[in-house]
Amino acid sequence: MIKNSFISVIPQEEKEENKGSVEFQVFSFTNKIRRLTSHLELHKKDFLSQRGLRKILGKRQRLLTYLLKKNRVRYKKLIGQLDIREPKIH
């Protein structure tokens, strides 16, 4: 698998400064999710990776919910940049 094929939305300078920002964390989780998804397409019975994927999806969802409550503009921009579907909010 090619690691460089993943998206680079956040410029390199910002990555060095802002590793704790919500946007960077969501970006990082999204790359991990895409990597695990492609892995699971080849290895359908890798249940530990499936569990890890579900945990990462939950973490990303909680961060996105937090960002939605705090700053809707940044949320919409991030969703658009990362090409993530907007979840149903209960």
Swiss-Prot record:
- Record keywords: Chloroplast, Plastid, Ribonucleoprotein, Ribosomal protein
Subcellular location per UniProt equals: Plastid, Chloroplast
The record's GO CC annotations read: chloroplast; ribonucleoprotein complex; ribosome
* GO terms for MF: structural constituent of ribosome
Pfam families referenced in this protein's UniProt entry, alphabetically: Ribosomal_S15
**Matching CDD domains, A to Z?**
Ribosomal_S15p_S13e (cd00353)
User: Which InterPro entries does the protein's record reference?
Assistant: Ribosomal_uS15, Ribosomal_uS15_bac-type, uS15_NS1_RNA-bd_sf
Question: Entry's SMART domains?
Answer: Ribosomal_S15
Q: What is its main location?
A: plastid
Q: Name one GO biological process term.
A: translation
Q: Which PROSITE patterns match?
A: RIBOSOMAL_S15 (PS00362)
Describe the protein's quaternary organization and the partners it interacts with: Part of the 30S ribosomal subunit.
**Family to which the UniProt record says this protein belongs:** Belongs to the universal ribosomal protein uS15 family.
Q: What is this protein called?
A: Small ribosomal subunit protein uS15c
- Supply the source organism for this entry: Dioscorea elephantipes (Elephant's foot yam)
